[in-house]
Curated annotation (Swiss-Prot):
Organism: Geobacillus kaustophilus (strain HTA426)
Active site residues per record: 34 (proton donor), 115 (proton acceptor)
Residues in the signal sequence: none
Database matches in SUPFAM superfamilies: LigT-like (SSF55144)
Keywords linked to the UniProt accession: Hydrolase
Protein name: Putative phosphoesterase GK0864
C-alpha cells in the first residue's frame, strides 16, 4: 500500500489555499491542502506498524510546528506547479530529516521546499497567466500546528488519514 506523511495547515490557510486549488489543482478532490514531509512510499502492514511506533516517538520529541506562509511561488521551469511558500524553520527541517533516516532511510526524491500546492497540470499559457497574477498578491499567515499525519492512498487515488501524531508528547488521536 502507498503511504505519505504530511502536515495539514490550520483551517484559515486551508480555506485560502482551497479558494485557488478548486480552480487550478487537478488533485483538489484527492487530498486537502498539505505540506508534504515524506513523499508517497510503499510499505506493508508490518512495516507500517513499526513506522507508526517510530512516528509516535518522533512526535513526542517534536515541539509545536511554526507555519509561516509568505507568498505564491513556482517550481518552473522544473514543473508548472504553483504553490504557497512555507518558510523553512528548524522544526520543519528536523522533522523532514528524521523522516528520511533510520527506519525511514532513503534519500528524499526532492530537495525539501516546504510548500502547499495550489496549482498543477496547467497548460503553459494558462500557467503563465495564473502565476503572473498570483505572484503579485500579498500573502501572510503565521500559525502553529500541533500534529502531523500518516496517510494512505485509496484505490480511487484519494488519501485518508491512517494515524495522527500529536507533537510535544501528547497522545495520538
Amino acid at each position: 500500500m502507498k503511504y505519505g506523511i504530511v502536515i495539514f495547515p490550520p483551517k484559515r490557510i486551508q480555506d485560502f489555499a482551497n479558494s485557488y486549488r478548486k480552480r487550478y489543482d487537478s488533485h483538489y478532490a484527492l487530498i486537502p491542502p498539505h505540506i508534504t514531509l515524506k513523499y508517497p512510499f510503499e510499505a506493508d502492514e508490518e512495516q507500517i506498524k513499526k513506522m507508526a511506533k517510530e512516528l509516535r516517538r518522533i512526535a513526542a520529541e517534536t515541539p509545536p510546528i511554526p507555519i509561516k506562509v509568505t507568498k505564491f511561488s513556482s517550481f518552473y521551469p522544473t514543473s508548472n506547479i504553483i504553490y504557497l511558500k512555507v518558510e523553512p524553520n528548524d522544526v520543519l527541517e528536523r522533522l523532514h530529516e528524521q523522516l528520511h533516516s533510520g527506519l525511514f532511510a532513503g534519500k528524499p526524491e526532492f530537495v525539501f521546499v516546504p510548500h502547499i500546492t495550489i496549482g498543477r497540470d496547467l497548460p503553459g499559457a494558462e500557467y503563465a497567466d495564473v502565476y503572473s497574477q498570483l505572484k503579485l498578491q500579498d500573502v501572510h499567515f503565521e500559525e502553529t500546528v500541533d500534529r502531523f499525519h500518516l496517510l494512505y492512498q485509496l484505490e480511487n487515488g484519494s488519501w485518508t488519514v491512517y494515524e495522527t501524531f500529536i507533537v510535544g508528547g501528547k497522545e495520538t488521536v
